[in-house]
Swiss-Prot record:
It catalyses: tRNA(Phe) + L-phenylalanine + ATP = L-phenylalanyl-tRNA(Phe) + AMP + diphosphate + H(+). Tetramer of two alpha and two beta subunits. This is Phenylalanine--tRNA ligase beta subunit. The gene is pheT. PANTHER family: PHENYLALANINE--TRNA LIGASE BETA SUBUNIT (PTHR10947:SF0), PHENYLALANYL-TRNA SYNTHETASE BETA CHAIN AND LEUCINE-RICH REPEAT-CONTAINING PROTEIN 47 (PTHR10947). Pfam families: B5, FDX-ACB, tRNA_bind, tRNA_synthFbeta. One of its GO terms (molecular function) is tRNA binding. Residues 702-794 form the FDX-ACB domain. HAMAP family: Phe_tRNA_synth_beta1 (MF_00283). Its main location: cytoplasm. It is found in: Cytoplasm.
Amino acid sequence: MIITRNWLKKYLNLDNISNDQINVALNSLGFEVDNVYDLNSLNSELVLGYVEQSKQIPDTHLKLNKVNIGTKSLQIVCGASNVDVNQFVIVAPINATIANGLTLTSKKIQNYESQGMICALNEIGINQSVINKEDQLKIYNVFDKNLDLKKYLGKDVKQIIGLDDYLFEIDLTLNRSDCLASFQILKELANYFDLEIKNYDNKFNDFKENDLDLKITISKKIEEQIKTISYSNFVLNNHLNKLDSIDDIFLKLNQISSTNNLINDLSLLSTLSTAQTHILIDLDKLKSFNLKLELINHNDKELLCLTSDNQIVNIIGLQTESKFSIDNNSKNVLNIMVNIEPNLMRKQQKLLNTSNINLQRYIKPINPNLFDLANLNLTSLLNSYNLVNKAYKVKVLKQTYKNKTEFEIKISEINDLLGTNLTIDQIKSLFKKLDFKITNKNDLLTFNIDPNRIDISSKNDLCEEVARLYSYDNIQEVALSFTSFKKPKNLNLKLENKLTNYLIGLGFNNTKTYSLTTQIDAKHWNLFNISDFINLLSPLSNLRQTYRTSLSKSLIDTAIYNHSINNKELKLFEIADIYNLNQLKQRHLVFLTSHHIYKNGLTHQLVENNFYYNKEILESIFDLYNLDFSQIKYVNNLDVIKEIHLYINATIYYQKQLVGFIYQLNPKFESENKLNKTFVCEINLDVLNELKNKTIEAKTLSKFQSSSRDLTIEISNDLIYQDVLLKAISDVKYITSSKVVDLYLDDKLAKNNTKALTIQFIFNDLDHQLTEAEINTEFEKIISNVKKMKVVIR
């Protein structure tokens, strides 16, 4: 959103307010100012000129022009195709520096002395993207219906066309979509600086009763997504199809291309002010006043359109189709205003693959009941160009949205929530220039909300608005105080909820599977050595006969089913209980990953699933339970069921108690069931709850840069990695952490009952920045310790 100082000056007295103050105000009010632009400084000198003579230079595309700049006439050679006599133009005289960096000098072109330059807009700082293609190579003709431009020859043309302006480019949050109407930002600044808004009510007031019998039928498919439909109409006087330069430049400064149609351009100016879009139609071109709003298949896209007799009148978000659009001869103009569910319009924008002033407002949550304000503003703009012969009131065809405009809240509630001691008078003064009305009965405040503020829907929103206007910087920082209540504690449940949220945050899907399985599977998948199975006396099926003894098989079956329906990128987890006849109730977690763990649809970047990704998730869970990692042991088990990979598996122990298992499925089993590479981890949460460290210790973080060293070793499968690691780092200083970053297996290693591990060691210190010499000394100790264990270093 762009706001300019000159536009604000039309309504506010800014004589004592600088651009920096406006910048600070906008940021203080929560409107982040991304950029500011001082247009006046782009060009050192530009004056208004009048082309008195223009002659073609033989055998060239150039013209020799005599340009009157008031005190004298200049001879200027110009190559623009549209330069001609009787034009008011922008002239950069000799020694002037213009926005494209060119400093003008007197020089000869085709043996003719050229004493300056007649300028096009893209040469003086206007973005070429908002200049129509046919105008990009043309000089700009200055026009103003209210000025006798001959009296201004030689004067600063920047003031005449609005290039002496200062721009504020504002980033709006979604909840402040109302400020897509510049009138809303105007009110915010008036309130901030305590200024009276002038000329705001200087509007057209001679509206006639609307007797036009127009019907717009809404397709049932989209009926609930259309919030409001209304219309008005105008009878126009004869008119020139030319926008004043100051208005034309203002549109371009707002990144909007003018349409070369005066009425359409004025509607765009109105939309900037009110945020309500206008669909303008030449009434005389309509054969029927029965229109329809429906989804139409147009160019193989299902687009929301306004139609008449099965002909598209307007694709919502774009200009009216030429067959029905207004032109220089239009006398009777229909103005349709709609408000549509933003989700539908976001889909429309995606299909149209474009962005414009109308679509930018259709896709945002804006007050659906802006039609009266918008019609008034558009009519006033038309009237300022002496275009209005008759103007008619708005007729509303559909209005489902009702503004919630009133809230009651006690002053104590506001102060308690914000930590302030505001009085009723102070709160009233915060909203002095805004369209809020505040009354009170004793300490009960009644707020009548600005109907444009549809983001305020609760008391908390209202308190946030008070804080914003009061300024967060003015709210004293006070440490939180807690009142403790004696409540039964269930730390285990809290940890489980955190665990669930953690996995969901990683992209896992929470699943629920059958607790009953076959008796054979219950025995085969009895990883945790559960005894005394629970068998149903009268099972409905042999497939659902026995309570399961682990969760793994259920999740693997879920993965197999998903692969069969081509859903292969899987992250699944389940938390459930295991039972037996001896009143055992064991809480288990199982998670499964299959195929790629990361897939970027845009760049086609893929990251393959691997053991260490799953192990890292597991260790994050251990960290949640505050376990001592030095007490965790991973033991490779060669005596596993056939569905589990013989080498890529580990039985997990903590303080010598069985915690669970982590493994890859056997490639043969994966192939038989058309699974991609799949890893499974199942752990007993009851063991974690029993052995967790309830004492949370705050550790000092080093402010110095850490360094790492990698070491690759060949280790026997008979050795326990944790034991090897503890011996390796014995008496080594500055170690903050270590982890396995790679595992390698080949036929030779497998034959020797070994595997290759790459371990990464992280070094740091709390007191000083470690030198390379210190790190290398300690790393040599690790190497020495490893060699003492007769472990091969690769």
